Regions:
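Flexible, glycine/charged-enriched surface loops at secondary-structure junctions
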Residues: 62-65, 162-170, 200
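Residues that form generic nucleotide/phosphate-binding pockets
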Residues: 152-159, 163, 174, 196
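Glycine-rich, aromatic-lined ligand/substrate-binding cores of catalytic
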Residues: 192, 196-200
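Acidic, metal/ion-coordinating pockets
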Residues: 1-158, 180-192
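Glycine-rich phosphate/diphosphate-binding loops and the adjacent beta-loop-alpha structural elements
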Residues: 163-184
Length: 200
């Protein structure tokens, strides 16, 4: 593995293991030179070994932080044992409340920072006995930016500021991108491809 598969945390007196699961289709969704020599896959048997290892090391709660996608992780939940939570991504689904599949809670928090997913677990004797979950909408115009993070971003951006501010063209309408749904920005890109390739 390139990265450690398991990280341990203690919250509220409970030992929590978080297992990472990378996007399994990386080799077919990215140029080969970017992932040369690496292999990717869903690999439920490897995830199960990591769950077992986490439990042996004293984890009371095991969380899978996954980029498989909501549909894949629903199927995965049916095959794994002793997995408490899957925080799933990639498919950008915004699920209002966690769903329970095979005693594994799945939560998907949308995309592009529109929501923060929150799940509260009631743990008794190393078992999840109850839970509450929700999506918290993020309204960027009412949240004050973190000054330290703003300074860090500005510092990273500074060498490229002139290039980032170069005008490439002007639009008569607002260009936006929604994430799950098409927006005007998507239309511009698709129209440009069709014009360039002379397609319908």
């Amino acid at each position: 593995p390139v990265f450690e598969a398991i990280k341990f945390f203690e919250r509220g007196g409970v030992n929590i293991a978080v297992i990472g699961q990378h996007f399994p289709y990386t080799p077919i969704s990215n140029p080969k030179y970017m992932v040369e020599g690496w292999s990717f896959g869903i690999r439920p048997e490897v995830i199960q070994k990591n769950i077992n290892k986490a439990k042996k090391k004293g984890a009371e709660v095991v969380v899978l932080l996954s980029h498989n996608g909501f549909d894949v992780d629903q199927k995965l939940a049916l095959t794994l044992q002793d997995l408490d939570v899957i925080l799933t991504g990639h498919t950008h689904d915004a699920i209002p409340e966690a769903i329970n599949i095979n005693n594994t809670l799945l939560l998907s928090s949308g995309s592009h920072g529109k929501y923060i997913g929150r799940i509260d677990l009631d743990i008794k004797k190393g078992k999840v006995v109850d839970y509450a979950s929700k999506l918290i909408p993020i309204f960027s115009d009412v949240i004050n930016p973190d000054p330290e993070m703003t300074e860090h971003i500005n510092k990273l951006r500074q060498p490229y500021e002139q290039e980032c501010n170069r005008v490439l063209g002007k639009a008569d309408t607002l260009l936006y991108r929604r994430g799950n749904f098409n927006g005007t920005w998507d239309d511009v890109i698709c129209d440009a491809i069709m014009i360039e390739r002379d397609t319908e």
